[in-house]
UniProtKB/Swiss-Prot annotation:
This is Auxin-responsive protein SAUR67. The keyword Lipid biosynthesis does not apply. Belongs to the ARG7 family. Keywords: Auxin signaling pathway, Cell membrane, Developmental protein, Growth regulation, Membrane. May promote auxin-stimulated organ elongation, such as hypocotyls, stamen filaments and petals. GO terms for biological process: auxin-activated signaling pathway. It is a peripheral membrane protein. Pfam families: Auxin_inducible. It comes from Arabidopsis thaliana (Mouse-ear cress). It is found in: Cell membrane. One of its GO terms (cellular component) is plasma membrane.
Amino acid sequence: MMINAKKLMKMAKKWQQRAALHRKRISFQRSNVFTSSSSTVEKGCFVVYTADKIRFAFPISYLSNSIVQELLKISEEEFGLPTEGPITLPFDSVFLEYLIKLIQRRMDGDTEKALLMSISSAKCSLQCSLLQQEQSTQQLLVL
């Protein structure tokens, strides 16, 4: 199910307004996606945080990308719409950086579909994976 562009823009604007008090300044680079710990956002960008609390700013044009739409949809399913605070994606920063590189390469349709399927099936949050790691460690200690 695809979210239409108007609805997605409206959702992103709503999330941005709710997160306005928690924003940090971004140092822009040529890659069009930025991470920083300062306090404001450049005009034409929206901000998300990863599960490991790393901040990313994307140009608004990324909202039309189906991968970014899926990430926002997963965030809404896992955390709901934030009433206070920023949009948080249920993935760590390493995974998000990898996705950004794939988006910037403008992959073909088949690759994008495969990536969307893998993202959808990997809805387990960082907390879930940490829990699994903890259980694995406990099992090793028992053996």
